[in-house]
C-alpha cells in the first residue's frame, strides 16, 4: 500500500487528517487511542482486546514516521506503543461506523464511560467519580 501524501494533526479538533492520493479522512484522537494497534490494547487475539475507557479528551502529543509503512502516535496520557500502518488507518476509516458502534456497546456493557474519571478530593485514592454517571 502506498504511503499517505499528507498527515496533519488538528490540535483544536483533536483529529488526525490523513490524505492518500485517492481519499482524505479525519480520525479523532479518542478513536485512534481506543483502537490502538498495540499489543497492550489489542492483546494477541480478539478475546484479549482491552476496553479503553475515559479517553474522550485525549490528544495526540507527537507523530513519528516509522519507515515508509506506519506512524507512531504518542498520546497525552503517555500511550505510545501502537504503530499505525497505512492499511490500518484506512481500515479504521472504512470500518468507523461498525468499530465505533461496537466500542460504545462495550462501554455500556462494562458500565464504563468515554469521560475520564476524576479522583475525589481528600480521598487519597479512596474513590472516584465519573461525570454523567
Where are the regions a protein language model picked out?
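Motif-centric detector for short Cys/His coordination patterns
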Residues: 1-133
